[in-house]
Amino acid sequence: MLDLTYETPAPKVISGAKEDWELVIGMEVHAQVTSAAKLFSAASTQFGAEPNNNVSFVDAAMPGMLPTINEYCVEQAVRTGLGLKAEINLHSAFDRKNYFYPDLPQGYQISQLYHPIVGEGEVLVEMGNGTARLVRVERIHLEQDAGKSIHDMDPNMSFVDLNRTGVALMEIVSRPDIRGPEEAAAYLGKLRQILRYLGTCNGDMQSGAMRADVNVSICRPGQYEKYQATQDFSHLGTRCEIKNMNSMRFIQQAIEVEARRQIAIVEAGGTVDQETRLYDPDRNETRSMRSKEEAHDYRYFPDPDLLPLEIEQAWVDDIAANLPELPDAKKARFRNDFGLSDYDASVLTADLDSAGYFEAVAAGRDGKMAANWVINELFGRLKKEDHAITDSPVSPAQLGGIIDLIASDAISGKIAKDVFEICYTTGRDPAEIVETEGMKQVTDTGAIEAAVDEIIAANPDQVAKARENPKLAGWFVGQVMKATGGKANPKVVNQLIAKRLAE
């Protein structure tokens, strides 16, 4: 069962020169829709193609070319909305957002201001120690991406690459529910995790497939609660938007430095201007780009080339029926079915590949032992070599085989680590490694008993001390394991030593 009991974390408080201030943050996340074709043309969305290779006549805004909606992009937006527990609008429409920029051939962007395809939803952002922030999603709308202007290829000229022009984006707009830099990064991380589970966006921030505009404002303690009670934004400070953030670390740094900038202005008796700003990570500062535009500045109007988008509830229901298991549900199942701790379940469900690998290892085996081997041994080794789980040289069947050898007392946990190392570097089968390398555990009580008796007889002083202090029995265990090359069954060794010392 999905357990959603949690406590709301305290907001981030920054001490100014005169008083304390709280942060209020909202985010607009631009997520590139996973689709082979663009939103209104059949041009490819392949990343890294030669400049201006993936451009159709529609993308280039050639005269007489009309947009045609990509149904799959609509389906992906609906799927995303359902994954965020959002309301799906059966009626939506596209509008023109008018502005001029060299990499926007049409002279406008096709977006959805008045009638977005997805309404209100939510994202539960866990912050550890039983705390979580429920961040409300105001809306999700579909829109076109712009192209890319390139200014560093020539000192006297700029260039334009239209490959990205017309690529489908989902703009996921949150309410101002985020209360600190860490929460902002955690929200973006959780949103990315959900989209990856859904298969609607790959979440690759480096390539620009996911980027965020971060709205930051400050308020005095108690003012946010007044806003919550009245939904009156006048209780909050003037917000500034930090544009095009594509790094979790930079998002946190930008929020912190922007909040401190606003605090300094207000405490000096000034007023914060509503504007769009850019974060400079080298100087760790935000810089003004332009005054913040409102909707009327873009002269939005319904796009006359596109009919309103009408979808049927039965189609939405069919998409909902085929949604994959999402992170929170998978995490709860791992805790319940495999007896895992909250931490282990979180690590293993961080991405689909890790979760799938663990389930394959744990099938028919002890879940806690499987989690221990996957997290501590496999993930630890992969991290050291900067490899992803998909590049693991040890298959789930091989790691499961090592666990089976431990469970059957064929090898000890210590020897199992040696087997894992050989398996990792050579790809050999664990059972074959144990057999050919002579690593099988000694379970013959007679042979172990002889080794125990020999160690006991050779160390009378240690025997006397161990009888007075039972904790010293571990020394004998170590000596027996050493004498048997680590192959003796530790459980049998402990039992025999305890028996001999009690005599």
UniProtKB/Swiss-Prot annotation:
Matching entries from SUPFAM superfamilies are given as: GatB/YqeY motif, Glutamine synthetase/guanido kinase
Main enzyme class: ligase
Q: Which UniProt keywords apply?
A: ATP-binding, Ligase, Nucleotide-binding, Protein biosynthesis
Show the catalytic activity: L-glutamyl-tRNA(Gln) + L-glutamine + ATP + H2O = L-glutaminyl-tRNA(Gln) + L-glutamate + ADP + phosphate + H(+); L-aspartyl-tRNA(Asn) + L-glutamine + ATP + H2O = L-asparaginyl-tRNA(Asn) + L-glutamate + ADP + phosphate + 2 H(+)
The record's annotation in Pfam families points to:
GatB_N, GatB_Yqey
**Enzyme Commission (EC) number:** 6.3.5.-
Q: Which InterPro entries match?
A: Asn/Gln-tRNA_amidoTrfase_suB/E (IPR017959), Asn/Gln-tRNA_Trfase_suB/E_cat (IPR006075), Asn/Gln_amidotransferase (IPR018027), Asn/Gln_tRNA_amidoTrase-B-like (IPR003789), GatB (IPR004413), GatB_C_1 (IPR042114), GatB_Yqey_C_2 (IPR023168), Gln-tRNA_amidoTrfase_suB_CS (IPR017958)
GO molecular function (one): ATP binding
Q: Which SMART domains does this UniProt record tie to the protein?
A: GatB_Yqey
* Any Gene Ontology biological process: translation
Q: Which domain of life is it from?
A: Bacteria
How does this polypeptide assemble, per the annotation?
Answer: Heterotrimer of A, B and C subunits.
Quote the NCBIfam families the UniProt record gives.
Answer: gatB, PRK05477.1-2, PRK05477.1-4, PRK05477.1-5
Q: Which family does it belong to?
A: Belongs to the GatB/GatE family. GatB subfamily.
Q: What does this protein do?
A: Allows the formation of correctly charged Asn-tRNA(Asn) or Gln-tRNA(Gln) through the transamidation of misacylated Asp-tRNA(Asn) or Glu-tRNA(Gln) in organisms which lack either or both of asparaginyl-tRNA or glutaminyl-tRNA synthetases. The reaction takes place in the presence of glutamine and ATP through an activated phospho-Asp-tRNA(Asn) or phospho-Glu-tRNA(Gln).
PANTHER family given in the database record: GLUTAMYL-TRNA GLN AMIDOTRANSFERASE SUBUNIT B MITOCHONDRIAL AND PROKARYOTIC PET112-RELATED (PTHR11659), GLUTAMYL-TRNA(GLN) AMIDOTRANSFERASE SUBUNIT B, MITOCHONDRIAL (PTHR11659:SF0)
Q: What is this protein called?
A: Aspartyl/glutamyl-tRNA(Asn/Gln) amidotransferase subunit B
**Organism of origin:** Roseobacter denitrificans (strain ATCC 33942 / OCh 114) (Erythrobacter sp. (strain OCh 114))
